Amino acid sequence: MLGLMQDQPLLISGLIEFAARHHHDGEIVSRRVEGDVHRYTYREAAARSRRVANALDRLGLAFSDRVATLAWNGYRHFELYFGVAGSGRVVHTINPRLAPEQIVWIANHAEDRVLCFDTTFLPIVRAVWSKCTTVKQWVALCDGAALPADTGIDGLVAYEDWIGAESDAYRWPTFDERSAAALCYTSGTTGNPKGALYSHRSTILHAYGGALPDALGMSARDSILPVVPMFHVNAWGIPYGAAMTGAKLVFPGAALDGKSVYELIEAEKVTLAAGVPTVWLGLLNHMEQHGLRFSTLQRTVIGGSACPPAMITTFKDRYGVTVLHAWGMTEMSPLGTVCHLKNKHLGLDEAAQMAVLVKQGRAVYGVEMKIVDPEGRELPWDGRQSGDLLVKGPWIISSYFKGEGGDPLRHDADGDWFPTGDVATIDPDGFLQITDRSKDVIKSGGEWISTIDLENLAIAHPAVANAAVLGVPH
């Protein structure tokens, strides 16, 4: 017997329309590549997203056609997230830090039909546009006045001209929630990059999971600064979670130096920020050099690589900011675990609490995980034995785009598991600790040695800004 609840598809268009209706005056603030600060509301963002959808219809793009971006975090990129996916196409975020030949390969492999780019990336686009054979429309994310007179790119149009000719009246289509919504390619350290193709369903469920109190804890009372780029795994899903909860969004654009990030945090009363350790290192150095303090920042999410214990201590003891140590990967949309102390930890001394906080945390609801030995046997959650980390869940890939690399999963009696390539321990409370990447771990004197542990020891020295440990045969 089935339940008698309405079967409403989980679609990304529903997020932006919910935000426009229920959080209509919620702010979205962006530092633009032009240097000024732009601000508007969720209601205005929704209207402009509909203009994007109409512009794509006018181009004749089919359902599931790919629309690529080469862009920083900003309001126009935000509009593309919703206008592209909401209209049934797929937003494909390309990492502009890749080599031009990799960008060409990715764009052609994805069969991108439109490519939208920030003007700071015009030199890259000039180098690749003639080789991107499937792209029929190039769009510069600026107004007509900011578009250079002679770009050398055939048919290039300014974004504001492109959507300015369209109506903001648009009826979002209804379709299968399992339809593709976004595409992001892995780094391709072992060959060509492979695409992770996210669905509407997986993206909405990921937004639900990420907004939970024991995950990122987003709410309408927050002002959120995603420093993690929108071209990398959808900025960890924060734009979707913010629309779901009505949180104020603050986009930093291209200015990611410590001074610029600090000024934006203070000016926009940011309460929650998210980024990789290198960004926070620059911020902390700037603050220390100038004797600065935070007036509103409460929490910062640190992921992308293991957070050094010294950074957690500095944020907590010097600035009163709680670090949420998180872990995930492109193939996981990306959120897997977030570290929050449990009630029983609150009475522990500082050293005992730090032993918990340096871990990557517990699984967000929706993510299942286990560690296995080389023969595939599951290992106990004792916090001591390490093994290969496997995961499964509704926002974790089942295969790569176009089947690249074959079947990536491991299949056993418990289901289909994605091998993360990480080596980890899990303690009895479910706290995950990544001890290494399986390809980085060092064996010396018959013992396995964690490069992460060695790096953290080095970074703890006040004279060391950052460190990387490499194994060298001898």
Model features per residue range: what roles?
Residues 28-74, 78-82, 99-104, 160-161:
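Conserved AMP-binding/adenylate-forming core of the ANL superfamily
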Residues 363-390, 410, 427-429:
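Conserved beta-loop-beta connector loops within the AMP-binding
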Residues 98, 104-105, 115-119, 273, ...:
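AMP-binding/adenylate-forming catalytic core of the ANL superfamily
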Residues 56-61, 166-178, 183-225, 237, ...:
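Conserved adenylate-forming
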Residues 15-16, 58-59, 86-164, 175:
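Structural core segment of the AMP-binding/adenylate-forming
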Residues 71-72, 89-107, 119-124, 247-268, ...:
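ATP-dependent adenylate-forming carboxylate-activation enzymes
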Residues 244, 267-275, 285-355, 368, ...:
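Gly/Ser/Thr-rich phosphate-binding loop
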Residues 204-223, 231-271, 286, 337:
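Conserved AMP-binding/adenylation subdomain of ANL enzymes
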